[in-house]
Amino acid sequence: MRCLKKKTLLFLLIFVSLNVHRTPSQEAHPARQRKPFFERLRRLEEQFQRFQQVTLTHLQNIANNYNVYHNMDVRFQSLVEQSQAVALAMNQSQAAIQGDVAHLKTWYRKSQRRSRKVDARLQALDLSLSTKSRQWVEKEGEQKAQREAIASLALSVQALQDALASLTQQVHSQGARLAALEGQTQSASSGTVALGLTTAPTPTQLAQRGPGSLQLWRDRQVAKSSPQHRSSPHDVTVHVQEMQKFQTPSSHQAAPPRTYQGPGNICNTDPVLIFPNTSTENVIFLSPGFLMPLRALSFCSWVRMATSHLGTLLSYATKDNDNKLVLHGRNSLVPGSIHFVIGDPDFRELSLKPLLDGQWHHICIIWTSVEGKYWLHIDRRLVATGSRFREGYEIPPGGSLVLGQEQDTVGGEFDSSEAFVGSISGLAIWDRALLPREVANLASGKELPTGAILTLTNVTSVGGFVQRAKCTCLEQCP
């Protein structure tokens, strides 16, 4: 651009100098030559103007081209910068990618090592599982054989339980009959007469004695006519001996022998405990309670009622259940009845109406978990029996045992409507089912059977208005 300007200026200077040198030579010519000169000058001026226009146009084109080139340079510079930025970003990305690739390679190597370890563990587990599966198959075979043996043993045990229950029922029935016969012989004879030497009474005589004696005579006649249903004395003796072998030894000493002073007189039965009213403070605690789980139970006592309803004789409560064992009476129940509760809410309603006459009576309530059988004896007579009551159940140890009140919590929350009013004497509890002869001996005033786990010697606390009375014979107590 600068070179072009210089050339244009140089051309103008040369042109002007030529025109200047021509002017003096022309002055000498005549005036007639001035006109063409001016025309030439005018044409030159027009040419110069055209040239100037062309030059300006050319210069404008050059300037425009320069601007285009300048813009292109700017754009190229921008593109260079952008390419540099892209290259930098590419370098950074490449560095990051290389780092990620290195990390992935490291992770891949670690994964390979872990996979090899896992493969080794899986192989070991597979081997162990195969070994255990073989052992499991062998154990399953052994367990199957054991289950078959257990099933066979259960059938044998069930058969033995059935046989034992049948024998126990026979022993109780035979004992009740023998006790009735002993009572008849004692009332009919003034001396001691052997049972085998007495003359069998006639049906007329038995009818005069009462319907119970006549029914007993009929049972004996049926037994004689049916030998297959008759139990010999030898069988009964053997069963009694077997039952005595399984009696649990007790830490309590046997009570002193009771003195039998004739019909209707029971003496030396332990102190008499008198509950005068329905106060909730009238309660007796026994300790220790049951030290071992009980699968059988015998509760026997002399009782004299002083009200028209039976109160609660005994209550055994644990933290899990406040009615694990209850002889529960209440003024809202049927007169003369109590609820025999084992493991609430199961119970059996027992009728004790003979006790409402205000006289002394001997009661024995017996229960065993074998087939859930239970028996109620009043004055040595079997008055009620049943089965399927808490079959297979165990009365747990460690609870609170009280007389005269029903516990709604362990050792408390008594209700006066459930309180016992009357007298108790000779109370004892066994962890086995007493035999009928043992029950008859108790009702006759003889010594306690061995193995009693609780008696009135275990009384640890007497509360409220409960009184202790020492009477030679029960009939003499107030």
UniProtKB/Swiss-Prot annotation:
Residues 1-25 form the signal peptide. This is Pentraxin-4. Binds 2 calcium ions per subunit. Its cofactor is Ca(2+). Glycans are attached at N91. Residues 269-473 form the Pentraxin (PTX) domain. It is found in: Secreted. Induction: Induced by lipopolysaccharide (LPS) in thymus. Down-regulated by LPS in liver, lung, heart, spleen, dendritic cells and peritoneal macrophages. Induced by TNF-alpha in dendritic cells and peritoneal macrophages. SUPFAM superfamilies: Concanavalin A-like lectins/glucanases. Ca(2+) 1 binds at D322, N323, E406, Q407, D408. Its main location: secreted. Expressed in liver (at protein level). Widely expressed at low levels with highest levels in liver. GO terms for cellular component: extracellular region. Keywords: Calcium, Disulfide bond, Glycoprotein, Metal-binding, Secreted, Signal. It holds the Pfam family Pentaxin. PROSITE patterns: PTX_2. Disulfide bonds join C300-C364. Ca(2+) 2 binds at E406, D408.
